[in-house]
A protein has these predicted regions:
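Hydrophobic, well-ordered beta-alpha structural blocks that scaffold small-molecule cofactor pockets
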Residues: 1-40, 45, 50
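ADP-ribose/adenylate-binding Rossmann-like module
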Residues: 79-99
């Protein structure tokens, strides 16, 4: 079983009250490689929050913290990462992308 699964957290925030912040911290605690992507530069602990569409290889999981309207600009990016799975967190469910 592979323990270090690269995860892209899309909709990352440096606000400790946001679920995306907690997700990054939890993933790092369990030694996963995390790529945090948000709309503002910043950090979650030692993890930088990147903006735009950072190129990544070997992505296991994309976990979404963006509502469906905001996801639209990332459709091609998400698919280009070729993740093994996409996690739609509560409030992010999107029939168009899940197909």
């Amino acid at each position: 079983m592979e323990l270090n699964k690269k995860t892209v957290v899309l909709g990352a925030s440096n606000n400790p009250e946001r679920y995306s912040f907690l997700a990054v911290e939890k993933l790092k605690k369990y030694h996963h490689t995390v790529v945090a992507v948000g709309n503002k530069l910043g950090n979650i602990g030692e993890t930088p929050i990147l903006t735009g569409f950072p190129a990544e290889q070997g992505v296991d999981t994309v976990t979404l913290y963006l509502n469906p309207v905001l996801q639209a600009q990332y459709y091609q990016y998400i698919l280009s990462l070729k993740p093994k799975r996409i996690i739609f967190n509560p409030g992010t469910e999107n029939a168009a992308l899940s197909e």
